[in-house]
Amino acid sequence: MNIIPAIDILGGRCVRLYQGDYKQTQIFNDNPVDVAKRWADEGATKLHLVDLDAAKVGQPVNQKTIEAIIKAVDIPIQVGGGLRNYSTVASLLALGVQQAILGTVAIEQPELVSDFCQKFPGQIIVGIDARDGKVATKGWLETSQVLATDLALQMAKLKVAAIIYTDIHRDGTLKGPNIEALRELATAVSIPVIASGGISSINDLLNLLALETIGVKGAIVGRALYTGGISLKEANQAVGQGRWQDVPPNLGSSTFV
């Protein structure tokens, strides 16, 4: 399973929100580039960036910061937030971003998602952010009547590369991921699902690892990495590629039970 550190950018700084509430913001670092370098140095194989300002206004805001991160690290980067038209997505991918994450546009203009998938195969991910099972849009400020599973099925048919599922009520709370919702979503679609929201411990990651065989292939971790609840190195050893439980017993005992 791929452990993906999250870097949320608001006003040029690295922050975390509580349940997606912009009024409940905690600043963790004034320089997101330094944060990206840290996670890369600690063994991250991919980074998850969100331009929170762009998610609200629907157009890029922290583009210079994102460009600086791309130049600073040599690992794949996925970026979301405010990607609602062709030129924005195309310019972002042209910078060297591996995958663009679409949110609001998946609800409002699914035909545009189809167009993106045809033009940029393998590079389009849809982020499904759910509140009580229904999809939230526009930086989580609005909630639609569309069920998360229904949207996932529709997006899978359009051939998006993966689905990122976030339970908004869990996001930033360290209360653990919504395992049942993830199980339902992963069972419904045949494309990879990436878990996000509430992950607080190695045990949470091990619970997600149990869903890997049905399609949960990654976990985005935010607040727990910043508060020290999860060590990226230990997380990779526990559930990442070449994890300890995959090592033959005769090569030594694991520190993880």
Curated annotation (Swiss-Prot):
GO cellular component annotations of the record: cytoplasm
GO biological process terms held by the UniProt record: L-histidine biosynthetic process; L-tryptophan biosynthetic process
Pfam family, one: His_biosynth
Active site: 8, 129
Gene: hisA
EC number: 5.3.1.16
NCBIfam families reported for this sequence: 1-(5-phosphoribosyl)-5-[(5-phosphoribosylamino)methylideneamino]imidazole-4-carboxamide isomerase, PRK13585.1
Family: Belongs to the HisA/HisF family.
Native source species: Trichodesmium erythraeum (strain IMS101)
Entries under PANTHER family matching the protein: 1-(5-PHOSPHORIBOSYL)-5-[(5-PHOSPHORIBOSYLAMINO)METHYLIDENEAMINO] IMIDAZOLE-4-CARBOXAMIDE ISOMERASE
Source superkingdom: Bacteria
Cell compartment(s), UniProt: Cytoplasm
Location (main, coarse): cytoplasm
Reactions accelerated catalytically: 1-(5-phospho-beta-D-ribosyl)-5-[(5-phospho-beta-D-ribosylamino)methylideneamino]imidazole-4-carboxamide = 5-[(5-phospho-1-deoxy-D-ribulos-1-ylimino)methylamino]-1-(5-phospho-beta-D-ribosyl)imidazole-4-carboxamide
UniProt name for this protein: 1-(5-phosphoribosyl)-5-[(5-phosphoribosylamino)methylideneamino] imidazole-4-carboxamide isomerase
GO molecular-function term, one example from the UniProt record: 1-(5-phosphoribosyl)-5-[(5-phosphoribosylamino)methylideneamino]imidazole-4-carboxamide isomerase activity
Cytoplasm is among the record's keywords: yes
HAMAP family registered for this protein in UniProt: HisA
UniProt keyword list: Amino-acid biosynthesis, Cytoplasm, Histidine biosynthesis, Isomerase
Main enzyme class: isomerase
Pathway listed: Amino-acid biosynthesis; L-histidine biosynthesis; L-histidine from 5-phospho-alpha-D-ribose 1-diphosphate: step 4/9
